[in-house]
Amino acid sequence: MNYAYPDEKGHYGIYGGRYVPETLMQSVLELEEAYKEAMEDEAFQKELNHYLKTYVGRETPLYFAENMTEYCGGAKIYLKREDLNHTGAHKINNTIGQALLAVRMGKKKVVAETGAGQHGVATATVCALLGLECVIFMGEEDVRRQKLNVFRMELLGAKVESVAAGSGTLKDAVNEALRYWVSHVHDTHYIMGSVLGPHPFPQIVRDFQSVIGNETKKQYEALEGKLPEAVVACIGGGSNAMGMFYPFVHDEEVALYGVEAAGKGVHTEKHAATLTKGSVGVLHGSMMYLLQNEEGQIQEAHSISAGLDYPGVGPEHSLLKDIGRVSYHSITDDEALEAFQLLTKKEGIIPALESSHAVAYALKLAPQMKEDEGLVICLSGRGDKDVESIKRYMEEV
């Protein structure tokens, strides 16, 4: 398969690009230049790998979920344990890389958006480590859902700005973070949390997250002497999935499955299934599939999981859908909750609600596969942050 994206202008087929105001163009080009240089600099790579190993705690285990496998029948189920990273999710793979990039570029301050709070915590964490000032924008609704993560960020020295505009969720937080960046661009780096935004952000985030898929390949081959037949990951903006999928893109014998949030159901207005129900448009500097109405107004996304309710999806996922290399599906709030409880009871592992969407789809897929086949789930984060809201949700039902 001939797959080499993005092109030199930052496009993934028709997707991606740089739809930014003139005031940001210089910074985006400067970032691209700095990133290319860093990727070719052995000292930068050495420093990044040092932190990934000694600070983040990589590599993360590839765990054979024996009880889940027995319960499902069919394929052997493996979990890539990103929940065991420092700060409890995959997000830090990207924030440590970008923070080192910010230091390299001479920036003193970092701005970021966050939905579930995981990216905010991971950003505040690396800023504390590297002595950078940190400002985090978070939607009002997400602040309510994720009080503990807000307190964590503040403990780490970050200033958390609550965003009341719009639906008070991730989309609105990104808007405000971009506005802030425009007016502080001389001394501030924007750490985008997913494979979104203008080029080079989708590529930078994908490349820093590719450690997930690269490790998985190596670990699975060491255990089974081959590659897995299927790989499953959840998708909001799509960074854990892109990090897992990208190293497998050329291995056409490996089926790749992306799982979006169907919320209350894709037939309702309350979902975040962008690739299932969306259409092409531009948001936050990039062309991609979006949830929008006929006038092109962005619709609110809904999911029980704060990290999946973004109304767009990364440009590379948009392309991978169109060319059929990744198969995209969606899982409802109720199915994700069920999978959350099942994994907790069967394996003693409490997954994030985001990751529970991937687990739920894997539960449907595994029984359709043969016993000598393997299925890897990207367990993108741990569920501590969700326990309180799940308790509330279960009491209401």
Swiss-Prot record:
Q: Where does this protein act, in terms of pathway?
A: Amino-acid biosynthesis; L-tryptophan biosynthesis; L-tryptophan from chorismate: step 5/5
Extract one GO molecular function annotation from the record.
tryptophan synthase activity
**At which residues is N6-(pyridoxal phosphate)lysine found?**
K91
One Pfam family recorded for the sequence: PALP
Report which reactions are catalysed by this protein.
(1S,2R)-1-C-(indol-3-yl)glycerol 3-phosphate + L-serine = D-glyceraldehyde 3-phosphate + L-tryptophan + H2O
* Broad class of enzyme this protein falls into: lyase
Instruction: Cite the EC number.
Output: 4.2.1.20
Keyword annotations for this protein? Amino-acid biosynthesis, Aromatic amino acid biosynthesis, Lyase, Pyridoxal phosphate, Tryptophan biosynthesis
Say yes or no: keyword GTP-binding present: no
Q: Which cofactor does it need?
A: pyridoxal 5'-phosphate
Q: Which InterPro entries match?
A: Trp_synth_b_CS, Trp_synth_beta, Trp_synth_beta/beta-like, TrpB-like_PALP, TrpB-like_PALP_sf
Show the CDD domains listed in the entry: Trp-synth_B (cd06446)
A single cellular component GO annotation: cytoplasm
Which family is annotated? Belongs to the TrpB family.
Q: Describe its partners and assembly state.
A: Tetramer of two alpha and two beta chains.
What function does the entry list? The beta subunit is responsible for the synthesis of L-tryptophan from indole and L-serine.
The record's annotation in PANTHER family points to:
TRYPTOPHAN SYNTHASE, TRYPTOPHAN SYNTHASE-RELATED
The protein in question is named Tryptophan synthase beta chain
Where does this protein come from, organism-wise? Bacillus anthracis
Gene name, per UniProt, is trpB
